[in-house]
A protein has these predicted regions:
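Iron-sulfur cluster-binding electron-transfer modules in prokaryotic oxidoreductases
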Residues: 1-135
């Protein structure tokens, strides 16, 4: 699986190289996908400067807004919400920017003390017990 991951990541780097070198940001919505570029890419491909650049130029939407557009404004919702933080986001990325965005939304939020469902990444697609639950 790691050999395939390296091959696919090298293909992505080749395709995105002009944008990476131009400093373009990649904004993702799904923490497991973002963590591939931010964490796994630089651990699997250690000899490519563009891999390091892509890692540094990849953001979750809330990170991008908080870091690159700190004065962004959004309509206030004024309601209660429950927040289930994605386990990849909490363990590999960060969750602070979600809180910043929730505050800007004007919501009364409660972050649930919840665990990992185990379905993100390749875990949910491995043959056996995981696969049947994920599909």
């Amino acid at each position: 699986m790691l050999k395939t991951a390296r091959r696919l990541l090298r293909e992505i780097l080749k395709e995105l190289r002009p944008q990476i070198q131009a400093g373009m940001c990649v904004v993702g919505l799904e923490p497991s996908c973002v963590s591939v570029f931010r964490d796994e890419l630089v651990n699997l491909i250690t000899d490519d400067e563009d891999a390091k650049r892509l890692s540094a130029q990849t953001f979750l939407l809330t990170e991008f807004l908080t870091e690159k557009v700190p004065d962004f404004s959004i309509p206030k919702l004024h309601r209660k919400v429950l927040v289930h933080g994605h386990c990849h986001q909490r363990s590999v990325l960060r969750f602070d920017d979600e809180i910043t965005t929730l505050k800007k939304l004007g919501v009364d939020y409660t972050v649930l003390d919840s665990g990992c469902c185990g379905m993100a990444g390749a875990f949910g697609f491995e043959r056996g017990d995981h696969y049947d639950v994920a599909i």
